[in-house]
A protein has these predicted regions:
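Small/aliphatic-rich secondary-structure junction motif
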Residues: 2-65, 160, 170-175
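Structural beta-alpha unit
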Residues: 2, 43-45, 73, 77, ...
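General small-molecule cofactor/ligand-binding pocket signal
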Residues: 38, 98-102, 153
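Short, structured coil segments at secondary-structure junctions
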Residues: 140, 148-149
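A short acidic, glycine-rich active-site loop
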Residues: 58-78
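Short secondary-structure boundary segments
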Residues: 39, 126-127, 156-157
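Glycine-rich, Arg-bearing micro-motifs that act as flexible, cationic patches
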Residues: 121-143, 161-164
Length: 175
């Protein structure tokens, strides 16, 4: 069996994110492997901002100046802040994880990252934030399972019913 040197935690800031992070960190520590934490930004959100940019021209006083570029930067900053808060709250501040943010179709981008980064195993939650798209298209996790060229570990346990509790309100360590 090939030695696991690089582990990718695919997070979407759903209720499973904290458990995915903890599991990936335990694996990385136990195997002395590099940890990548990935988050994909849905392009539909960017398209909405581009539409708002067009409308801004007609409704200058109604919209603040928002561009797709500064929206993308703000989203990356916010998600990075949320991830840092989760890592700290879970008592994982000692880990060194490289963060990767991409824009695109989530399962496609995750597969590209696996190939580009030579990832050995992917840790992912079984579903994301909503079940609406699942009815029509299937979950990102299902597509990753079908198309991923490496092993995929599905974390079934929710850390919390409320992601905010995991990030900010509950102190897991020190209480």
């Amino acid at each position: 069996m090939k030695k696991i040197k690089k582990i990718m935690a695919a997070i979407d800031l759903s209720d499973y994110t904290c458990s995915v992070l903890e599991t990936a960190e335990l694996l990385a520590a136990g195997l002395q492997a590099e940890l990548l934490v990935t988050n994909i930004i849905n392009p539909e959100n960017i398209e909405t901002i581009k539409l708002a940019e067009q409308l801004e021209h007609d409704y200058k006083n109604f919209f603040q100046a928002v561009t797709a570029d500064n929206y993308l930067e703000k989203i990356k900053e916010e998600r990075s802040r949320q991830l840092d808060a989760m890592v700290e709250q879970l008592g994982m501040g000692h880990i060194s994880a490289r963060k990767i943010y991409r824009v695109g179709v989530p399962f496609e981008q995750l597969i590209w990252i696996v190939k580009d980064e030579d990832v050995d195993i992917v840790v992912i939650g079984p579903k994301g934030k909503t079940n609406l798209s699942t009815v029509l298209f299937g979950t990102t996790a299902e597509k990753v399972f079908r198309h991923c060229p490496v092993s995929v570990l599905s974390v079934r346990e929710k850390k919390s019913d409320d992601l905010r509790a995991c990030m900010f309100l509950e102190s897991k360590k020190g209480q």
